[in-house]
């Protein structure tokens, strides 16, 4: 069974259409109106081997905050929907990813509990139309909407672009590991028998 989810979200601030395919990696198309964010989401999908299509229009005359946060909410909602059946799933995933001088780390638990730990210094406040503080807001929105525990950490680096890129790639790789099925896991990967 293919694990897919689609969702539309319309508010007075944003209009978002998102389609996620966990087990298909061919189709990646991201258009949010925030160039750097599009680049990061494309890297996330490519390195996670996910199909991901996003069309978003936001109130960019204000700033990119609502667009970035709402895309995170919709992506998290789609993840929660597509991961309802957790039988045979690894549940946990972690990845270190270098990007030149920067090193990013992400660990994920598909636990049914929403939690974010974010650590990292982003010295450059803006990359194009993207306020770099929105990196944490995006991960918080995804974690809370998806009901996952997510730890994202920039261990070191100098270039802000490289630091954020390492995190998004690590997020894709860690999520891929967590959602993959494992034939050695019988039922749900929890002593409780449910998540």
Curated annotation (Swiss-Prot):
Database matches in InterPro entries: IGPD_sf, ImidazoleglycerolP_deHydtase, ImidazoleglycerP_deHydtase_CS, Ribosomal_Su5_D2-typ_SF
GO biological process, one term: L-histidine biosynthetic process
UniProt-annotated location(s): Cytoplasm
GO molecular function: imidazoleglycerol-phosphate dehydratase activity
Pathway: Amino-acid biosynthesis; L-histidine biosynthesis; L-histidine from 5-phospho-alpha-D-ribose 1-diphosphate: step 6/9
E.C. code: 4.2.1.19
Keyword match 4Fe-4S: no
One GO CC term on file: cytoplasm
Pfam family, one: IGPD
Catalysed conversion reaction: D-erythro-1-(imidazol-4-yl)glycerol 3-phosphate = 3-(imidazol-4-yl)-2-oxopropyl phosphate + H2O
The family this protein is said to belong to: Belongs to the imidazoleglycerol-phosphate dehydratase family.
HAMAP family listed in its UniProt record: HisB (MF_00076)
Name of the protein: Imidazoleglycerol-phosphate dehydratase
GN (gene name): hisB
């Amino acid at each position: 069974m293919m694990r897919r989810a689609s969702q539309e979200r319309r508010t007075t601030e944003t209009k978002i259409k998102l389609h996620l395919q966990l087990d298909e990696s061919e189709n990646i198309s991201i258009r949010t109106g925030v160039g750097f964010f599009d680049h990061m989401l494309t890297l996330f999908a490519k390195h996670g081997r996910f199909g991901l299509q996003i069309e978003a229009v936001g109130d960019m005359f204000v700033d990119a905050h609502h667009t970035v946060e709402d895309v995170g909410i919709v992506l998290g909602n789609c993840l929660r929907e597509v991961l309802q059946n957790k039988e045979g799933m690894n549940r946990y995933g972690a990845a270190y990813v270098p990007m030149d001088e920067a090193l990013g780390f992400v660990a994920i638990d598909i636990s049914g509990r929403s939690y974010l730990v974010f650590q990292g210094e982003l010295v450059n406040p803006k990359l194009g139309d993207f306020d770099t503080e929105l990196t944490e807001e995006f991960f918080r929105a995804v974690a809370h909407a998806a009901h996952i525990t997510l730890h994202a950490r920039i261990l070191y680096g100098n270039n802000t672009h490289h630091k954020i890129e390492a995190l998004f790639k690590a997020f894709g790789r860690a999520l891929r590991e967590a959602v993959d099925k494992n034939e050695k896991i019988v039922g749900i990967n929890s002593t409780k028998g449910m998540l």
